[in-house]
């Protein structure tokens, strides 16, 4: 029996006994083979495997999809109504907001279908079909059509996906997008046929004082009182097929929608989550965990924190800027705080010690097996990481500063083409490139960009980058700053933001009226952009083949861990594909003398209220409803109104918006966060500390009905009392 088959058998055999209780981001298509369905039933599930995932029929899988490009959403009515998180819909809410119509502050409630807002660029994606293509890939390797490392490259897999799609019965059907992906570090491969609906409209969103209550302070924290939800609707053509926005489109008649339970929950109740976890790294070695901490998290924390201070000051001073930068700030601060929490949790939870123990056990196993590949693999990973870490640190600093931090710049490649056209006096090429420049100018100076705010960001980040990266390793602009501006960063930034061709409308109009080679050569923003891209390319060249080498080493290491038959997870790392995690409603104790119960109520909202702090403002109407205890049928038997609850489910980024389901597959909540103490969970799952923070569906319905006046939406839903 070859090693790959032995490894795959080990995966199946380990499934029942290997993963700790509640740990696991399980592949739907392997539930029966790996016996995970049996474990779910032992914990309380009352459904069969085909109720969750049925390749030949309709199942719960068909009510769950990808919301936008990085979240999960679920269908909660036969009319294509989507429930997801407020923070998942935040970009769309911000997109529709203005000082005159401030939906971020005031909320948005569509009182009828014709009031639902088209949201250009927003899509909802269902998984139509999943196929195992491992044998196809392995045959290509055996035939030497590709190398082993090429087998899990996006170049090969995208080409293979297109090839298989061309032979599929789904070819020619509207909205189908094929995707082939590696699993278990390239030991398994699956093909996903996705159905993408591009007409998604905004239906409901509470005010940010509900949807983001607690803000940055409460993010990743428990106890939680955030009403983190928003609602959208899928529209389709008259045949129910995907179609770009049209006034004639109609709400999608969905194959499946989730029933909603308001029966309540108690400690120990079964809870499962279906969704699209984005990325985990559960199989890292000690050296790789250290690299994550020092080369990725640490510089990200420092650079984002500095930028966010600038943005926050500007946002507090202007409602216009607050709306412009709301989504940018939220996206930045989310993983800024995550990085802080991850580094702290790695230390507090002794993740390095746990990984070292695993490596020691693996070394013993490899020696007993007399397997040279296994005996050497960790040392080879460590050698590679010693080379990648300093480069990765530079890459993080570069991308966080110049690509994720400072927005202004110039399309130097377009400028080069225009310069060449001017030199050759090629009128058609000049006209074509100026047309592109006009598009770029409008793209830079879009409604969510403030040139003066970005100027302040640049003045803060350019000197910070110089502190973090030694001379000789920085982009070439630092030589210019030193020589031509005598090290004065503010003077350099002002020159770029005042005099560059794309800096403002007057400069741009003057240039396109009479473009010259000299103006392009002197343009500071063009020089700046070229320098940052040159440095990016230089670092990629330094990294060279090291990522491919590490990928192959990981394939060996993970195969060996499977064969070792240790209590290791038998599920692959998350890669934004559909997964299922099961567990229970459960409290936790993060440290001696501290005990957190498993749910919160609206009492905590009033306890946290602070009218002087934007993060803890309570809307007057909500406060009135709470004080009057006007909760309707959604209250607990004792009269309290539940807000959030904890479960032991295994989630990560991408699961935001995922449905939390009870033993009958009924919706009881919407997952939206993890707890602070377990932020090392992407690297190592800790059963005692890992908790998923969920929004109670009863609070969603209460806000929708009592505050939003959206009884018509509730009437669409199937409510189980």
UniProtKB/Swiss-Prot annotation:
Enzyme Commission designation: 3.4.14.-
Signal sequence, renumbered to the chain: 1-21
Entries under SUPFAM superfamilies matching the protein: Trypsin-like serine proteases (SSF50494)
Keywords: Aminopeptidase, Hydrolase, Protease, Serine protease, Signal
Chain positions of site Critical for substrate specificity of DPP7: 674
InterPro entries: Pep_S46, Peptidase_S1_PA, Peptidase_S1_PA_chymotrypsin
Pfam family, one: Peptidase_S46
GO biological process, one term: peptide catabolic process
Class in the EC hierarchy, top level: hydrolase
Keyword Kinase part of the UniProt annotation: no
UniProt-annotated catalytic positions: 87 (charge relay system), 228 (charge relay system), 656 (charge relay system)
Known role: Catalyzes the removal of dipeptides from the N-terminus of oligopeptides. Most potently cleaves the synthetic substrate Met-Leu-methylcoumaryl-7-amide (Met-Leu-MCA), followed by Leu-Arg-, and to a much lesser extent Lys-Ala-, Leu-Asp-, Leu-Glu-, Leu-Lys, and Val-Arg-MCA, while this enzyme does not hydrolyze Gly-Arg-, Gly-Gly-, Lys-Lys-, or Gly-Pro-MCA.
Name this polypeptide is given: Dipeptidyl-peptidase 7
Native source organism of the sequence: Bacteroides fragilis (strain ATCC 25285 / DSM 2151 / CCUG 4856 / JCM 11019 / LMG 10263 / NCTC 9343 / Onslow / VPI 2553 / EN-2)
Source organism phylogeny: Bacteria, Pseudomonadati, Bacteroidota, Bacteroidia, Bacteroidales
Name of the encoding gene: dpp7
């Amino acid at each position: 029996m070859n090693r790959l088959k032995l490894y795959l058998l080990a995966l199946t055999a380990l499934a029942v006994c290997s993963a700790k209780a509640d740990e696991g981001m399980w592949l739907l298509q392997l539930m029966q083979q790996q016996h995970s369905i049996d474990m779910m039933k032992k914990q309380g599930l009352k459904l069969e495997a085909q109720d969750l995932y049925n390749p030949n029929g309709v199942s719960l899988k068909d009510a769950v999809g990808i919301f936008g490009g990085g979240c999960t959403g679920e269908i909660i009515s036969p009319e294509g109504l989507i429930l997801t998180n407020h923070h998942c819909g935040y970009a769309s809410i911000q997109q529709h907001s203005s000082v005159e119509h401030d939906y971020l502050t005031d909320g948005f409630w569509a009182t009828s279908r014709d009031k639902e807002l088209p949201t250009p660029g927003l899509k909802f994606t269902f998984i139509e079909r999943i196929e195992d293509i491992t044998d196809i890939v392995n045959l290509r390797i055996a035939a030497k059509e590709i190398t082993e490392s090429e087998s899990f490259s996006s170049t090969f897999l995208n080409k293979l996906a297109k090839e298989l799609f061309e032979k599929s019965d789904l070819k020619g059907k509207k909205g189908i997008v094929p995707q082939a992906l590696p699993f278990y570090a390239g030991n398994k491969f699956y093909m996903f046929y996705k159905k993408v609906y591009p007409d998604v409209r905004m239906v409901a969103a509470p005010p940010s004082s509900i949807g983001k209550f607690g803000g940055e302070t409460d993010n990743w924290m428990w106890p939680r009182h955030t009403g983190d939800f928003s609602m959208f609707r899928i529209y389709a053509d008259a045949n129910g097929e995907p179609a770009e926005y049209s006034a004639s489109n109609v709400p999608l008649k969905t194959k499946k929608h989730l029933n909603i339970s308001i029966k309540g929950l108690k400690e120990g109740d079964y809870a499962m989550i279906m969704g699209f976890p984005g990325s985990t790294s559960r199989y890292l070695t000690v050296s790789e965990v250290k690299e994550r901490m020092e080369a990725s998290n640490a510089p990200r924390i420092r650079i984002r924190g500095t930028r966010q201070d600038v943005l926050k000051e500007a946002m507090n001073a202007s409602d216009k800027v607050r709306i412009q930068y709301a989504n940018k700030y939220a996206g930045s601060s989310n993983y800024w705080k995550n990085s802080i929490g991850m580094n702290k949790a790695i230390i507090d939870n002794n993740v390095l010690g746990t990984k070292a123990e695993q490596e020691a056990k693996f070394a013993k196993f490899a020696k007993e097996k007399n397997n040279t590949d296994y005996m050497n693999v960790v040392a080879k990973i460590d050698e590679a990481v010693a080379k990648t870490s300093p480069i990765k640190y530079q890459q993080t600093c570069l991308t966080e500063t110049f690509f994720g931090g400072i927005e202004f710049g110039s399309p130097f490649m377009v400028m080069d083409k225009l310069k060449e056209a001017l030199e050759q006096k090629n009128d058609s090429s000049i006209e074509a490139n100026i047309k592109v420049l006009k598009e770029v100018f409008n793209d830079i100076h879009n409604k969510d960009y403030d040139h003066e705010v970005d100027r302040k960001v640049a003045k803060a980040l350019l000197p910070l980058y110089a502190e973090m990266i030694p001379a000789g390793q920085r982009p070439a602009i630092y030589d210019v700053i030193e020589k031509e501006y005598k090290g004065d960063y503010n003077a350099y930034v002002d020159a770029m933001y005042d005099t560059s061709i794309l800096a403002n409308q007057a400069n741009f109009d003057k240039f396109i009226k009479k473009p010259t080679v000299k103006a392009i050569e002197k343009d500071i923003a063009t020089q700046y952009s070229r320098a940052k891209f040159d440095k990016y390319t230089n670092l990629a060249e330094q990294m060279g083949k090291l990522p491919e080498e590490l990928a192959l080493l990981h394939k060996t290491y993970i195969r060996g861990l499977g064969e070792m038959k240790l209590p290791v997870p038998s599920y692959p790392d998350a890669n934004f594909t559909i997964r299922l995690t099961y567990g229970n409603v459960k409290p936790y104790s993060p440290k001696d003398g501290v005990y957190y119960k498993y749910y919160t109520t609206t009492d905590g909202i009033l306890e946290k209220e602070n009218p002087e702090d934007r993060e803890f403002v309570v809307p007057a109407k909500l406060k009135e409803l709470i004080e009057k205890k006007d909760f309707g049928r959604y209250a607990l038997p004792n009269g309290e109104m539940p807000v959030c609850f904890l479960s032991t489910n295994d989630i990560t980024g991408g699961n935001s918006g995922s449905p939390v389901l009870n033993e009958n597959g009924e919706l009881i909540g919407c997952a939206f966060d993890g707890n602070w103490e377990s932020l090392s969970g992407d690297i190592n799952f800790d059963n005692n500390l890992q908790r998923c923070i969920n929004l109670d569906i009863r609070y969603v319905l209460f806000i929708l009905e009592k505050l939003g006046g959206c009884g018509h939406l509730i009437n669409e839903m199937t409510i189980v009392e």
